[in-house]
Amino acid sequence: MIMADRLELCSALTVGGLTPYPELLRQIRTESDIPVRCLIRCRAGDFHYTPDEIELMAAQIRNLKSAGATGFVIGCLTPNGDLDTESMIPMIEAAEGAPLTLHRCIDVSRDLCKTWRDAKALGFDTVLTSGGASDCEKGMDAIGQLLYLRDTEGGPEILIGAGVNAKRISFFRTRFPGARAFHASAKTLIESKMLFRRDDVPMGLPGLDEWHVQQTDESSVRLCKEALNQ
């Protein structure tokens, strides 16, 4: 089986991802030794958090670290759209030196380059970004600027995400030969086995698809890896 180099583990992909369960991480650990960075996001919505939410996420980091997480994916913003470095300190301390990725809060921050530099100052080794756009192709110019910062100033790797597939990896690699890290859900939808369905009684947001389960597609992962290695 051709696997990814690293796994970002999260729950609730339909809302952009939330903190996963330690039990799920432990199950993964029994089956694979792939490095796992866990997303830490206690709720859906924006990335400005209360002190109680920060305390909760620091506790989630400690719990997941004890369950086998090798790194964490975190991020907080101030109301003005800057990286909230002060609020992130408790989470960074809870990680106890584990590698850190800044998640896509950068894409809704006021200044992507400033946010990248702030992440560098905090010790992050990776920044996940779509270039401040709804998908990576639309954010290509901004991603190019961030890759330039990485190469000229040294600092966090640029992990390109949002809409990544094998075709786009090849496209990015042609335009930016230095693009070397890509983040993809590589998901497919599995039809629910439920025969009796009540479409008029949603369990979540109205209109949310509740009759499919998202699952990683092995062939998509393989094609992405092949495109990266070309």
Mark where each language-model region is.
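Hydrophobic faces of well-ordered beta-strands that scaffold small-molecule active sites
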Residues: 7-9, 36-40, 72-74, 100-104, ...
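A structural motif
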Residues: 4, 33, 68-69, 124, ...
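Active-site-adjacent beta->alpha loops and helix N-cap segments on the catalytic face
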Residues: 13-34, 51-56, 76-96, 109-115, ...
